[in-house]
Amino acid sequence: MESVAKPATTKEGSAKQAAIVVGVLALGWFAIQVAFIPLFNKVRGGGSDKKDDDVNAFTPDT
């Protein structure tokens, strides 16, 4: 007789399964974000990869 895993039918099993699914979805979303950062930046209009420190410098209005 072959041993087959039973589906989670208890509240504890269901909560654990839901936590695993949410964790996997979050990890997948994060991986996609990291993988496509250069593409997302170009689509948003930040096509230049060069850092311009003068643009981010604080200049008070006096």
Swiss-Prot record:
Ribosomal protein listed as a keyword: no
Record keywords, A-Z: Chloroplast, Membrane, Plastid, Plastid outer membrane, Transmembrane, Transmembrane helix
Residue ranges, Chloroplast intermembrane side: 1-17
Leader peptide range in chain numbering: none
Transmembrane regions listed in the UniProt entry: 18-40
Localization per record: Plastid, Chloroplast outer membrane
GO cellular component, one term: chloroplast outer membrane
Topological domains, Cytoplasmic: 41-62
Topology in the lipid bilayer: Single-pass membrane protein
Protein name: 6.7 kDa chloroplast outer envelope membrane protein
Biological source species: Spinacia oleracea
